[in-house]
From Swiss-Prot:
It comes from the Viruses. It is a single-pass type III membrane protein. The chain crosses the membrane at residues 20-40. Residues 1-19 are virion surface. The keyword Iron does not apply. One of its GO terms (biological process) is disruption of cellular anatomical structure in another organism. This is Envelope small membrane protein. Its main location: host cell.
């Protein structure tokens, strides 16, 4: 069954529809790529925030604990013999 010739403006064998769908597909892919990049940026911001809020204070506390608990090494010349 063919489409009636009276309703055909340009006989392009579906090229306009094909181009329209390709452009729509390209626009959707571009929007998806932008959304994916924004999700990656959000993950990086959350990682940096977690590092700043959790990791660095814990590291400073651990370094302070290490320096507080550090003892001098045994030196036999300074030892007292009883």
């Amino acid at each position: 069954m063919t489409f009636p010739r009276a309703f055909t403006i340009i006989d392009d064998h579906g090229m306009v529809v094909s181009v329209f769908f390709w452009l729509l597909l390209i626009i959707i892919l571009i929007l998806f790529s932008i959304a994916l990049l924004n999700v990656i940026k959000l993950c990086m911001v959350c990682c940096n925030l977690g590092k700043t809020i959790i990791v660095l204070p814990a590291r400073h506390a651990y370094d302070a604990y290490k320096t507080f608990m550090q003892t001098k090494a045994y030196n036999p010349d300074e030892a007292f013999l009883v």
